[in-house]
């Protein structure tokens, strides 16, 4: 079914196609026709962060920024769906055009800039969702006009409001499309930010009688030294998990494409290798008690298995969904299922 719709969607402006595609998913969900788009997936429970996921394949943040399509996205078979990135106040993001497909490379460049309706709107949308078939992650960020020195206030504002509704929360400090945001990954800034968020997390756990795991999402463009420093900080602060990785600012893998010089983060097939290298190095540096979520360049079941072999406990896709359609979800789940049945093939490769 998606193979029939894709040529039409790809004939449209990428951001318009994004909205139209989500509307179509909502319609399919309401009319009970989602099975025409996505195969039924047998359960494959995976316990990570103390949570049991129906299966280990999730949707990465960015597709549903405001949590408006939760039920429809779960109907595609994802074991978990991550919504956001959300900020305390609504913001328009960067000027359009800001989303570009590179079909020859199975890649996307985006410079969206955390466009979203604000955390209060997301909370209302999550409260309206009625059929959460998996676990819900909420990805939080800071407003563009909030200086890094005050970034913790934005993250705490979001953390407080989404905590009662989320199964887990992701702290996004790695988008390349908010000026200066990635500076929060520097060792001193990272320690200062995450230590305050960890304190708030424990306060909220006591207040709500429920501990919601908090993850940190990192960039693929970190040097080995920066990766090691981040692992040291995040391990010492006992974060619940790390998502590796966000989009890359390195466009060398798409050099020569007419859109290669568009500013923004590159995702899709060209980021697979580098994001997996970062994942593998983090796994070797972090305590085993800190699970990893592998994301970046998953366009096949084999790609998902490669992430697991590099040390991921869960995987996420986004760009792959755009190029492959909903069939990618079941393909990834079944590939991981086969790997579980033959675990000798899943040893973490050395650096």
From Swiss-Prot:
EC code(s) of this entry = 1.3.5.2
Q: Which domain of life is it from?
A: Bacteria
Q: Which Gene3D superfamilies match?
A: Aldolase class I
The residues that hold FMN are 61-65, 85, 139, 172, 217, 245, 268, 297, 318-319
List residues binding substrate.
65, 110-114, 172, 177, 246-247
Gene Ontology cellular-component terms listed: cytoplasm; plasma membrane
Q: Its pathway?
A: Pyrimidine metabolism; UMP biosynthesis via de novo pathway; orotate from (S)-dihydroorotate (quinone route): step 1/1
Subunit text: Monomer.
Q: Which family does it belong to?
A: Belongs to the dihydroorotate dehydrogenase family. Type 2 subfamily.
The identity of this protein, by name, is: Dihydroorotate dehydrogenase (quinone)
């Amino acid at each position: 079914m998606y193979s029939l719709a894709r040529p039409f969607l790809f004939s449209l402006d990428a951001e318009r196609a994004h909205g139209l595609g989500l509307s179509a998913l909502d319609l399919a969900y309401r009319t009970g026709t989602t099975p025409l788009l996505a195969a039924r997936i047998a359960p494959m429970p995976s316990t990570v962060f103390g949570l049991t996921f129906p299966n280990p394949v999730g949707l990465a943040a960015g597709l549903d920024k405001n949590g408006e399509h939760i039920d429809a996205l779960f109907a595609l078979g994802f074991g978990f769906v991550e919504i956001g990135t959300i900020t305390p106040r609504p913001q328009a993001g960067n000027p359009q055009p800001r989303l570009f497909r590179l079909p020859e490379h199975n890649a996307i460049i985006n410079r969206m800039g955390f466009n979203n309706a604000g955390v209060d709107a997301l909370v209302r949308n999550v409260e309206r969702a009625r059929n959460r078939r998996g676990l819900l992650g909420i990805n939080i960020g800071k407003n563009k006009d909030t200086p890094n020195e005050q970034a913790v206030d934005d993250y705490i504002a979001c953390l407080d409001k989404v905590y009662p509704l989320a199964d887990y929360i992701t702290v996004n400090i790695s988008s390349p499309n908010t000026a200066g945001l990635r500076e929060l990954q520097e060792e001193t800034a990272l320690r200062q930010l995450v230590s305050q968020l960890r304190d708030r997390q424990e306060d909220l756990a006591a207040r709500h009688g429920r501990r919601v795991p908090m993850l940190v999402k990192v960039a693929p463009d970190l040097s080995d030294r920066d990766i090691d420093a981040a692992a040291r900080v995040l391990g010492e602060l006992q974060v619940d998990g790390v998502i590796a990785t966000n989009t890359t600012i390195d466009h060398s893998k798409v050099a020569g494409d007419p859109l290669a010089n568009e500013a923004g983060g590159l995702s899709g097939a060209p980021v697979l290798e580098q994001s997996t290298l970062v994942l593998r190095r983090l796994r070797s540096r972090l305590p085993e008690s800190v699970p990893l979520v592998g994301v970046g360049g998953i366009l096949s079941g084999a790609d998902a298995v490669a992430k697991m072999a590099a040390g991921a406990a869960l995987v996420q896709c986004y760009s792959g969904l755009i190029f492959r359609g909903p069939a990618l979800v079941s393909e990834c789940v079944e590939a991981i299922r086969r790997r579980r049945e033959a675990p000798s093939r899943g040893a973490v490769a050395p650096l």
